[in-house]
Structures are given as C-alpha cells and as structure tokens.
Amino acid sequence: MSSQEASKMLRTYNIAWWGNNYYDVNELGHISVCPDPDVPEARVDLAKLVKAREAQGQRLPALFCFPQILQHRLRSINAAFKRARESYGYNGDYFLVYPIKVNQHRRVIESLIHSGEPLGLEAGSKAELMAVLAHAGMTRSVIVCNGYKDREYIRLALIGEKMGHKVYLVIEKMSEIAIVLEEAERLNVVPRLGVRARLASQGSGKWQSSGGEKSKFGLAATQVLQLVETLRDAGRLDSLQLLHFHLGSQMANIRDIATGVRESARFYVELHKLGVNIQCFDVGGGLGVDYEGTRSQSDCSVNYGLNEYANNIIWAIGDACEEHGLPHPTVITESGRAVTAHHTVLVSNIIGVERNEYTDPTAPAEDAPRALQNLWETWQEMHKPGTRRSLREWLHDSQMDLHDIHIGYSSGAFSLQERAWAEQLYLSMCHEVQKQLDPQNRAHRPIIDELQERMADKMYVNFSLFQSMPDAWGIDQLFPVLPLEGLDQVPERRAVLLDITCDSDGAIDHYIDGDGIATTMPMPEYDPENPPMLGFFMVGAYQEILGNMHNLFGDTEAVDVFVFPDGSVEVELSDEGDTVADMLQYVQLDPKTLLTHFRDQVKQTDLDDALQQQFLEEFEAGLYGYTYLEDE
C-alpha cells in the first residue's frame, strides 16, 4: 500500500488522532499495534494475530488487551506533570492515583503497579477498598477513599493507616466525620482526612452532572466551614490534609478544567487562612481521551493534550500559592479513563451481511396501477439527457410513490410481487441519485447522509452491545470501529453494525467519518461470504465493568498481548469468558437441575435411545459452551 493510500485511510477513520501512536495501518492494509511508541520496532499485525489465535482455538468475540499500553499511558502522564513542574519551578510532588472503578480487573491493577512508576490507588466502595488494601503493599504510595462510607468502610481505611499506608479518607457527607473520629479513637490511630469541595464550576457533556453545585458528592462552602470547626473542636484539625474536587469525567474543554482548578485553588488558600495545613491537592478525574479523533470540544473528544492538561493544573495551583505565599502542595489526579481506554480492543466476527443489490429494472405491465407507472416514469426521466429536475425532486417523487404503494399494499391494492418490484426500483433510483451527488456541495450533504443510511449494508456482528460497549447504548458514546484488514482499499461502501441480542437497541448509531461523525461506517469493498473481522477500539475504560447480561450474553474471552522489539509476541489467556451455565447461575437457574428436567422430558418421548442420548449430549455441551455464536 502506498503512503498516499495509507494516509487516506488514516484520515477516513481518524486513526492518527485517536490511535495516539498505539494503532496504525501497515503496508498490508492491516491494523498494527505498537504498545510502546517509544519502542516503534515492537509492533504486531492485529489481523494476523487474531487469525493465528483462531487457528489455536481462540473464540470470538474476544478482548485483546495490551498491558504495555497501560504502562506507557502511566509513564506519559507522569512525564507530562514532571515537565510542567520543572517548567514552572513547582516544588510539590505529583501522584497519579488510579480509580479502580474504571476497570477493576486484576490484570489492569497489577500491570499498573508493576510498571515501576509512582502510583496511588483510589477506592469508592468497601469491595474496592479491600482490593486496594490487598495490593497496597506493592505500591507503598497513596490510597484515596471516596464514595459513601459506613462504619465498616471507615474502619477498613483506618486499619490501612494503622498498617502504615498513607490512606486519605475523603469526607463527602457531614455524617461521616463523627464515625471517623469515633473509630479512630477506638483503633488508636490518627486519621488522615480529605474534604471534597463542591464547586460552582462545572464541565459540559455526558458526565457534567458529576461536578458542579448539584453534584451527588461533596460539601458546600458552609459545610466545609462546619467540618473545619468540628475538627478544631475535636483537636484533629491537623488530620485534614487533602483538598479534593471533581469537575466531571471526560472533560472536553481545557478552559473548563482551568476554571475549575482556579476556583478550587481559592479553597486551598482559604483553608490555609483558617489554619488548615492542606498538603495534597486532589483535582479528581476529568482528563479525557479523544474517542473521535476530532481534537474538538464534542462530548467524545478533547481539545487538549497531556502537556496542556498538566500545565493548566500546575500553573493555576502554583500561581495561587505564589500570590499568597503558601507552600506548593502535592498534586494528585485520578486519571482512570486516560490510563485504561486505549489498552483494550474488542475483536469479533461478522456472522451475516444484508446488502442492497441493484439490478437492471424492467418496465411494469401496461395495466399496472398508476403509482407503479409514476415510479417508472421518474426512473426514465432520470436518464434523459438535459433534464432540469433536481436530484432532491427525483428523490422526493420516488419516496411519495413508494409511500402510496406501501399504503395500497396494506389495503390489498398491490400484490406482493408489485411491492417487491417497486422497492427494488426505488433502491436503484437511490443508487442512481447517490452516484451524482457531490460531497463537496454543502447542499448535497443532507441527501448524502440520508441515502448512505438508507443504502448501507447491515452487518450482524457476533457480540452484545449491552455487554461489551454499554456506554454506546446507554449514553450514545462513540467508539472507534473499523475492519482489521482491507484498509488498503478505498472505502466505497457504507455499513451499520447490529449485535446478536433480541433488542432493536443493539445497534451502533454513530461512526467516525473523517473529521466528522456519521450514522454509517465507511467500509472498503469486501466479500460478503467472507467479511473482515472488526475491531472495537478504546473500550478499556468502564465497558468491561458496566457491561450487563441482556439475553444472558456473558463476559467475552480476554487475552493479554505482550509485544517485544525482536518481533516476538506472547499471548496469555486472562479470562476464559462466561459459559451458558455461568450466566444461568447468575439468575438462580441451576444448570444441573435444568439438565435433569430436560433429561426427564427426553425420556418421555418416543425417540430411540441413540437419538435421546445425542440430544442430551448436545444440551449438556451447550450448557458449558460459550454464550456467543460459535462456528460448527
């Protein structure tokens, strides 16, 4: 593939921007993965890797996870803050604290811990805190405890502090502080406290409700003052060491981030005036990733990079400290999405394709109903040289005629054959109009979009949107989706992707199309009998954890892929995926009981013994098989 062709494909799918140097198109037109862009020779052809794994028994759909990307993301964020601190002359430290709610899988937590980079962990529930405490011995860093807390949660955090860990209990509700002080006294431990301030500043987009004055968590200004006085009265004011705020997840606009940090810096200054020695400034989450590759303020993009993000935070805090003669605090960010999103690709196979095929139309019978004659006359006029009717007018006329035919069919005025003829002719007319449209003509764009959606191939993909990409369904989040091969060809076709659940919501509605978003996906020409595998990229944050069991489709298989500079690749199975039996047990349906009931029914039939045994074996094999479709 020429460099010009490769460049065109990169632009079509915006790989150069959302891929962030981890994903590219190689000379074969295949997706290649470079888990560590600092070691460019260490890369793998993803299409070849998947096919090799399939030959060894790998089932699809499957998650292909690249732990080296996790580690590179962690290094990159740490490096950005190091550069920002050096540029400003900032004296405080920086810690990235990973909120495990983003992806609690062991492979993710341990890959980050073993990176050799400074790393803290954040918990938002008792279960998460137990996981964090169990891994804390490997980090010897910071633990931040957020979320609603009961007595057991608080005791666990204080036990961690008693064991020598640096555990910050962030007060998010005034009711928590009394329990903290009681349990700290019982355990004879000095608590290390934080306070989450509820800011007026708020981001925009799909996650804006997690920040601002109406947010679920945090203390208002009057409550912050009340907390300070409560601690002062208890002789524990020195325990309040961390200031925390959260603007929202996936902040698209750097100006919103800068505004929020400046407001929170005022809290830092005012708390020092009250005698509170705040040592850590936790700016929470918000560091976004560019799912679209548009470098914009849209909900699924960001208009900044790591360096600009780090600079805005360090300079805002540093300026506030310099203005008021205060020490530079340790800066903490809870950057889970930015660390994990890129490292996982869901790969699946297309199990069926429904294409709109075009045939040379034939004239209707002379005595055909008027609506059929009108449709045919429009078709003939489209092919007359010098016609002055617009493309839009042709399209509208044909749509009206087809609408009349559909209504007439319902009342018995048209036969099934006549309806089929009309629909096929209409498709041919749409195809003819589509060929004459100019994408550079702004007036044509609405018609192009309408026809692309109408004429797109329907691809039925072996996956559950609700299990593997729940945010695409729940909040209409966009994820990069494209074939793993065939990217050396011009994307002349369009497609929409449908999952295998029995739900009309199981469809992807938005796709990357150059610098914009479309309702259909660009596709290179392909063999409908042997369609390419598809990759769903950047699904490493939240998707595995939020996935649900709609239609009892379970977790997919997952493998960890390690790529080395000499070209060698190591693949480890990290999750075998759920069986049908696993999913049935989730809903209190015991597989053994079901098998017994089925056996009893089979025995009551008049089938011969051999056939009874065959059916029993098939039923039992299905119970312990994959929940997704499998090849024979």
Curated annotation (Swiss-Prot):
Signal peptide limits: none
EC number(s) per entry: 4.1.1.19
HAMAP family noted in UniProt: SpeA (MF_01417)
Record lineage: Bacteria, Pseudomonadati, Pseudomonadota, Gammaproteobacteria, Enterobacterales
Any one GO biological process: arginine catabolic process
Cofactor requirement: Mg(2+); pyridoxal 5'-phosphate
Protein known as: Biosynthetic arginine decarboxylase
GO molecular function: arginine decarboxylase activity; metal ion binding
Annotated metabolic or biological route of this protein: Amine and polyamine biosynthesis; agmatine biosynthesis; agmatine from L-arginine: step 1/1
Binding site for substrate: F281, D282, V283, G284, G285, G286, L287, G288, V289, D290, Y291
Family per record: Belongs to the Orn/Lys/Arg decarboxylase class-II family. SpeA subfamily.
Protein role: Catalyzes the biosynthesis of agmatine from arginine.
Record-linked Pfam families: Arg_decarb_HB (PF17810), Arg_decarbox_C (PF17944), Orn_Arg_deC_N (PF02784)
Catalytic activity: L-arginine + H(+) = agmatine + CO2
Domain of life, source organism: Bacteria
